[in-house]
Amino acid sequence: MDVPYDLNSYIRVLKLASTPSTDEFLQVSKIAGAGILLIGFIGFLMFAIMSLLPGVGA
């Protein structure tokens, strides 16, 4: 493990990185939130279907 090389790599990445603008942050947040809601809704549908079918699920 070459510590000076690793530190230089990390510093180079941090220099290139920038904080997102407010619009960019809101767009990413909305997309991530929509994805979380979609996965939750799919899970709920699966649970509901499994609960309604006789002999399947709990």
Swiss-Prot record:
One of its GO terms (biological process) is protein targeting. SUPFAM superfamilies: Preprotein translocase SecE subunit (SSF103456). It is a single-pass membrane protein. GO terms for cellular component: plasma membrane. The keyword Ligase does not apply. One of its GO terms (molecular function) is protein transmembrane transporter activity. It comes from the Archaea. The chain crosses the membrane at residues 36-56. Keywords: Cell membrane, Membrane, Protein transport, Translocation, Transmembrane, Transmembrane helix, Transport. The keyword Protein transport applies. It is found in: Cell membrane. Its main location: membrane. Gene3D superfamilies: Preprotein translocase SecE subunit (1.20.5.820). Essential subunit of the Sec protein translocation channel SecYEG. Clamps together the 2 halves of SecY. May contact the channel plug during translocation. Belongs to the SecE/SEC61-gamma family. Component of the Sec protein translocase complex. Heterotrimer consisting of SecY (alpha), SecG (beta) and SecE (gamma) subunits. The heterotrimers can form oligomers, although 1 heterotrimer is thought to be able to translocate proteins. Interacts with the ribosome. May interact with SecDF, and other proteins may be involved. This is Protein translocase subunit SecE.
